[in-house]
Amino acid sequence: ELNSIKGKKVLVIGDVMLDTYHIGNVKRISPEAPVPVVRVTRTYNVLGGAANVARNLLGLGCSPYVVSLLGNDHNGNTMQEMFADLGIRNELFHTEHPTITKTRVIGNSQQVVRLDFETENECLNEEIEQKLLDAVKRALPEVDIVVISDYGKGVCNDTVCQQVISASAGQGKKVIIDPKGTNWEKYRSATIITPNLKELSAVSGMDVRNEDKEIHNAANRILKEYNLTSLLVTRSEKGMSYIAPDASQDIPTEAREVYDVSGAGDTVVATLAAALAAGIPIAAVSYTHL
């Protein structure tokens, strides 16, 4: 099954960001304020957000194609160089807003602080919106599946999501969505959405406990309300639940010690996209083994 994944073309549209890490040691407290002084010994950058989905797809042997926005700045140039080095095809359009950047300072293997560089509630103007949609429509004929990676930073607005879903359906392409927020009207008629338990509770308006029956009940309500084909609910240590009108399955996980959960949702959606692009049925997908 893994061999069938290799070479599958996956279109990823969403909010890309740069994750920067400063790693060092803490041996004293600052005399200026009661905070640790981190002596930095190493700094590195990682593709984040929708770009991390693409990086995961590449690791699985797929051929990702990214459509997104970048700031016309140093961090934007850094991201473009990283895409080029990895061989990830892309159409990245510049905006007047800075490239979304998350900077983490790690001292003695513990995160000390995270600095977020971004613009609140970035709204797309019509020109940029149309550029994104035109890029998607150009890419659609050659890809096997579509991922919308919504981090709530502006790329995945109502118009973009609905037009991507509609255009994909018109060409028989499945659309997988990693959602953000409770406005799921923009995801109407998607193939599969991958909320975590907290997101499922929020969008359903129910206090959903991490129990099979409660999750299935809430998910079935959402499927009907938004005309969705299926949901894959991630449930932390209890694994995942796949819910569709004609078939449902609870997929357990293997217990492992976890040091860092950041990017876990990106890994889920990338693995799911790769499997579906290869024609592997949901019921046959074991995320632990993939």
Regions found by a protein language model. Give the residues of each.
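Positively charged, low-complexity intrinsically disordered leader regions
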Residues: 1-27
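Conserved phosphate/ATP/ADP-binding segment of small-molecule kinases
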Residues: 153-248
